[in-house]
């Protein structure tokens, strides 16, 4: 990116947050480049080092809806209505995650990340894989 304008943004990391944020920025007219130190997980089998699933509540769904991928993720999400607690006496307590009929949803972190990166690219975001940030020139950063 040789020419700098006030509309160019660089994001370090194409994880869940970086990819989602890039979609919102691109839709607001910014030229967005993401630099990701890992290879493209959509093309290679990468061990992410994170939990396999993550739980999405209402706030997470709103973020995905704004990015236009809510319906795609709902197809693979599994509702979790509550948790069961087993105490030392062997007693069981059930705790709902919300009011009757409400749930949080388990979904694959990897699938969600792949969908977010693909949607980011559809919105013009350029993702540079296998690129590690080794420093920042603070004088040229706005």
Describe each region flagged by the PLM.
Residues 53:
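A conserved FAD-binding loop/helix module that cradles the flavin
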Residues 11, 50, 105-106:
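A generic secondary-structure micro-motif detector
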Residues 26-49:
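Glycine-rich FAD pyrophosphate-binding loop
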Residues 21, 44, 138:
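Short glycine-/acidic-enriched loop or helix-start segments at secondary-structure transitions
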Residues 2-6, 57-142:
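Conserved N-terminal helical subregion
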Residues 4-34:
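N-terminal Rossmann-like FAD-binding beta1-loop-alpha1 element of flavoenzymes
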Residues 17, 34-41, 88-95:
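Short amphipathic alpha-helical segments, especially helix-boundary/capping motifs
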